[in-house]
Amino acid sequence: MSLYFRPEKAVLGDVIPYYDNGVFKPFYLRNYRANRDEQHQDSWVMLSTTDHIHYTEHDTKIVGGTGSVIKVDGLYHMFYCTFQKLPEKNYMNHAVSTDLDVWMEIPEDRFASDDVIYEPIHWRDPFVFWSEEENCWWMIFAAQKKGKTTRRGCVGLCKSKDLHHWDYCEPFYAPMNAQCAFECPDFFRMGDWYYLVFSSYADRYQTMYRKSRSP
């Protein structure tokens, strides 16, 4: 028994926390790297645990980058990113499930950057949540804003009424002080403060946060 979970023959990346019906069910990105073959393919994997010592793996068969999972009216929604090489371009993707084990991708919900507000390459890591203030869904994500300066790293923003059709909005957070996209953003309220958490891969790899009295 090990205190820390480690996948067999693979590396673990970008844990996506989730809690459902009394059970912790974090997802992670499984990457086989040198061990990749027909039987070992990269994918999102869900772990189930009640004590954070004993884990059961559930392969979702979803292939893609970091994202988030929410539950709406009994249906689970997964949002994640995928990467196109030629021409280089990233996409946001949507899948649904009734049990967190079997997922159905929705190809028609896939969408790329508008290439007006945001660059098409740095467009990933969607985090979706309900905005009480605006009565709609918000998606924040790692992005680079279009512009002449190189310091265009930001947390982007899209909004939706139905989780299927998204409107492009100006960045949620864009200090214009870093070239890198602000990765794996998370947003939550604690007490009277709203917190935005994200990671940076510039000259120093670090996790940072910003807080505000309003979203």
Regions found by a protein language model. Give the residues of each.
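Beta-rich carbohydrate-recognition and catalytic domains
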Residues: 1-125, 129-182, 189-215
